[in-house]
Curated annotation (Swiss-Prot):
HAMAP family: Glycerol_kin (MF_00186). Gene3D superfamilies: 3.30.420.40. This is Glycerol kinase. ATP binds at residues 11-13, 263, 306, 310, 408. Keywords: ATP-binding, Glycerol metabolism, Kinase, Nucleotide-binding, Transferase. It comes from Cereibacter sphaeroides (strain ATCC 17025 / ATH 2.4.3) (Rhodobacter sphaeroides). It holds the Pfam family FGGY_N. One of its GO terms (biological process) is glycerol metabolic process. Inhibited by fructose 1,6-bisphosphate (FBP). Key enzyme in the regulation of glycerol uptake and metabolism. Catalyzes the phosphorylation of glycerol to yield sn-glycerol 3-phosphate. Belongs to the FGGY kinase family. SUPFAM superfamilies: Actin-like ATPase domain.
Amino acid sequence: MSHILAIDQGTTSSRAMVFDASLSLKSVAQEEFPQIYPRPGWVEHDPTDLWSSVAATARAAVERAEIDGSLAAIGITNQRETVVIWERATGHPIHNAIVWQDRRTADLCQSLAEAGQEPMITERTGLLLDPYFSATKVKWLLDHVEGARARARRGELLFGTVDSYLIWKLTGGRSHVTDATNAARTMLFDIRRGEWDAEICGLLDIPMEMLPEVKDCAAPFGMTRADLFGREIPILGVAGDQQAATCGQACFRPGMMKSTYGTGCFALLNTGAERVTSRSRLLTTIAYQLGGQRTYALEGSIFIAGAVVQWLRDGLKIIREAGETHGLATASDAAQDLVIVPAFTGLGAPWWKPDSRGAVFGLTRNSGPAEFARAALESVGYQTRDLLEAMRADWAAGAEGVLRVDGGMTASDWSMQFLADIIGAPVDRPVVRETTALGAAWLAGMQAGLCPGPEEFAAGWALERRFEPRMEAATRDAKYARWGRAVRAVMAV
């Protein structure tokens, strides 16, 4: 039987998984890498760490699967918006990667907004003027690395999101490409026409010579170096992490929603061929592109989801492992009604306040680790409801009323029950929770002719558990109103 390698390059770790042609998981390898915080609000990665962790985990996963040379295709999924610029001749990065969480270009975004540029940018890219996206990060690098812009104009430097950089490394510098979903997150790509936007590139003084070729999500992206896996292997599927999860969750029908809980939380609502312009400051993006046909989505992005649990562990040191939050939340005094607004790197959708900072409301002398754990987990549910309320307001034909979930936090039954309670809708957790890697594997497998098309793949999606709302409507509304007051207070400071 043929096998597929899925590379999942995330914000805090790189993972690789081997699937067989029926998309059953055969092996997993994972490796964390350092986070770099040069200044408050700045977040960087060393691109060599990204590459070395990907190469190591890919080899390890293939070895553990014991597949005897039957590797037929590679799919890649990745943290989006993160920016790498490297030398064409050597492949060496000219600076650390600037990560999607980084806020250093907030002033630049503000000045562009004040100059009246946001409506044009939003109309073409579907995105808002925010440091989250790649474009202003690229400009910052070209402005601050000596000689970079001139070198880029001469064709000596290349830009890419993480997928593009990894493909360059995997292919030994033979392929400078990306896919439509990653391109759509740069704020340089016209999602209406499916091409790089010359006017926006000119506005930011970004030479178009450094941009990668854009392909479908299932397409030939290049062949790996023979020394990596013993022979050349085709890279046949690429999608940004949230779009890969959308595919892995089989959200192919307009109106279907999924929400992924990792470092951040990202909810996507499939809007089909309709490019819905948000009135609620959500993002209009490409869900996936197959056969040259773009399927669009509304997306809401929360910067801090699983990261709030990391804060409990690494910042407050009230837990040693993430799994401890479940027991603490269950044992907490719900009457205290503690509220945490985890705006550690600003507020994401639908607020988009990069300068806001986190706060805790309702502290008493009896507030302890259990109450903090409960409030931290609840904050993720509240933020998800913020996104879903905005989606429902934007698209009358929208949300079917069931939310499909995936990601590390979904292992917590307590968190998923609270999520169902606070959004007032069923939450479906799939049997296969590695939906991001699954989506990448499916894209590559479909292109290789090993896996079925969307309709047949969707028919095989399996439910592990449905969480139905149990909370009384009056309680739900009161708790959500309290959250709203807390968010407004944070934005007012």
